[in-house]
Amino acid sequence: MTVQTAERTITLVQAIWPKLRKEAEKQCEVNPWLAKDLARKILSKKTLRESLSCVLALPLDHVTGSSESMENWFYSILGLNDEKIIRSAMIDLDRLYTTNPACPDLISAFLSFRGFHALQLYRIAHGLWSEGDKTSAVLVQNWTAVAYGVDIHPAASIGDGLFLDHALGIVIGETAIVEDGVSIWHNVTLGSTFKDSGARHPVIRKNAMLCTGATVLGRVEVGENAVVAAGALVTKDVAPNRLALGSPARDVGPVPQYFGALTNPNCTNK
């Protein structure tokens, strides 16, 4: 991470918490029925870390049986590596809000979008895995799969600013690498071919897009800004800035301009 990128990230994290609180206060005025829920998740919290811990723990109550203990546990994990997970989460949140036309405001992205929640639970599991607590990491992986239908192995390497749209039926294998700014739709699989050991899952480069039902198998590379079309089966590399279509997938030309709002990190729908 460059110094400029680090500074932008710090500015982003500092700006999001007061904005979330302001939007929560406004929503309490618009709909007083939500005041208790918004107080529980945001307005009663002193920090973004406290709030995110609560938001992630509460939907798991039916799985774990104790959202309060999960909230405290998640709070401790979110503090690992100088709150690196928090920084990644806020980059994810900003990407979701700024590029998704279906997301009306920042508080909706934070409270209601399952892709954001599932991704942060992966980040918690990955933090545990990296600390050597693999059993706990796999438990969080399982809870996430049960609650959200998203199964990301905690050893997978995932960058910042991901956009998981709908977040149903997503599977990402143990040795997969997903770089910054990637967009993934529902029912996408990053799997192995069962013929390899070691690094056996795909590498998805920056700002690539994997559309609904795409399957990418083996240690193949989807290049930067490339798009894998809906239902495509990829078993060979996809070059940067190219569109792969079909089963088996084939290169059908450059990525059309209308994909730019999601493949170009500088584009926005807001």
UniProtKB/Swiss-Prot annotation:
It is found in: Cytoplasm; Nucleus. One of its GO terms (cellular component) is cytosol. Pathway: Amino-acid biosynthesis; L-cysteine biosynthesis; L-cysteine from L-serine: step 1/2. GO terms for biological process: cysteine biosynthetic process from serine. CDD domains: LbH_SAT. Transmembrane segments: none annotated. Signal peptide: none annotated. SMART domains: SATase_N (SM00971). One of its GO terms (molecular function) is serine O-acetyltransferase activity. Its EC number is 2.3.1.30. Keywords: Acyltransferase, Amino-acid biosynthesis, Cytoplasm, Nucleus, Transferase. It catalyses: L-serine + acetyl-CoA = O-acetyl-L-serine + CoA. The keyword Acyltransferase applies. It comes from the Eukaryota. Gene3D superfamilies: Hexapeptide repeat proteins, serine acetyltransferase, domain 1. Belongs to the transferase hexapeptide repeat family. PANTHER family: SERINE ACETYLTRANSFERASE (PTHR42811). This is Putative serine acetyltransferase. The lineage of its organism: Eukaryota, Fungi, Dikarya, Ascomycota, Taphrinomycotina.
